[in-house]
Amino acid sequence: MDTRYTHSPKDISHYSTEELRKEFLVEKVFVPNEVSLTYTHNDRMIFGGVTPTTESLEIILNKELGVDYFLERRELGVINIGGPGFIEIDGRKEAMKKQDGYYVGKETRQVIFSSEDAADPAKFYISSAPAHHKYPNVKISIDEIKPMETGEALTLNERKIYQYIHPNICESCQLQMGYTILEPGSSWNTMPCHTHERRMEAYVYFDMEEDTKIFHMMGDPAETKHLVMGNEQAVISPSWSIHSGVGTSNYSFIWAMCGENITYTDMDMVPMDELK
């Protein structure tokens, strides 16, 4: 597991492109037959990819977290963006097709991931945050979620937001997680942009062609920076940073947040004339 530390806005004001990428970008989220995770000290979120091929995979971080088992003091969100697979939670095995999600509560002792076909492996994107209470495990299908339709074709930001781990769907301590799909012809996400001082966030971009790129905007609104990102790459967004992007084509991304509350609308909008 890779560890990333926290920064203030002043810390990054003179960072080079290489330094920004090293601190905030995760270049390889899904590694075949591996659990590939990042631990950020921003609200102590863990995120990354689990890509089982010929063997089942389990997240084991006892030593790294100082616990007896991974979810002893944590909750977990899972969304499959690959081929059909399975998730086994404390002995109960369930199928997970593409776009299926799962909320797994605190004190769940074992979570095992597997694929139906090694040639078309499942790609489980996971996010985990510290938890103080045990809430029920819930399987989440995208078909059961009424999307928020927002943006316009005229402003190139027409998109559907599917809220998986959200009070309307399931209970959680502090983790929120969802899936945003941009319509063909749209390229902007989260613009006009915002920050949320009370929560950090992480994105993973995907459903992109090989030559499609995302210009992910970050940093203090008065001193913005950007990262050029490719398919299935992730980025950390501290609470003080904007997090927006524009692609050379449409794309999808999974967002995950944790922090002081689970109020999705708790955000501080940034007027366009304040961006620099």
UniProtKB/Swiss-Prot annotation:
| One GO term of the biological process aspect | pectin catabolic process
Single GO term (MF) = 4-deoxy-L-threo-5-hexosulose-uronate ketol-isomerase activity
Q: What's the short name of a Pfam family annotated to this entry? A: KduI
The answer, when asked if Isomerase is one of the entry's keywords, is: yes
Q: What class of enzyme is it?
A: isomerase
Q: In which pathway does it act?
A: Glycan metabolism; pectin degradation; 2-dehydro-3-deoxy-D-gluconate from pectin: step 4/5
- Tell me the Gene3D superfamilies matching this sequence: Jelly Rolls, pectin degrading enzyme 5-keto 4- deoxyuronate isomerase, domain 1
Q: Which HAMAP family match?
A: KduI
State the name under which the record lists this protein: 4-deoxy-L-threo-5-hexosulose-uronate ketol-isomerase 2
UniProt KW Isomerase keyword: yes
Q: Which reaction does it catalyse?
A: 5-dehydro-4-deoxy-D-glucuronate = 3-deoxy-D-glycero-2,5-hexodiulosonate
Q: Which cofactor does it need?
A: Zn(2+)
Q: Which family would the database say this protein is a member of? A: Belongs to the KduI family.
Functional description taken from the UniProt entry = Catalyzes the isomerization of 5-dehydro-4-deoxy-D-glucuronate to 3-deoxy-D-glycero-2,5-hexodiulosonate.
The free-text note explaining how the cofactor binds reads: Binds 1 zinc ion per subunit.
Gene encoding the protein: kduI2
InterPro entries registered for this protein in UniProt: KduI (IPR007045), KduI/IolB_isomerase (IPR021120), KduI_N (IPR027449), RmlC-like_jellyroll (IPR014710), RmlC_Cupin_sf (IPR011051)
Q: What is its EC number?
A: 5.3.1.17
User: Which terms are listed as keywords in the entry?
Assistant: Isomerase, Metal-binding, Zinc
Q: Where does Zn(2+) bind?
A: H194, H196, E201, H243
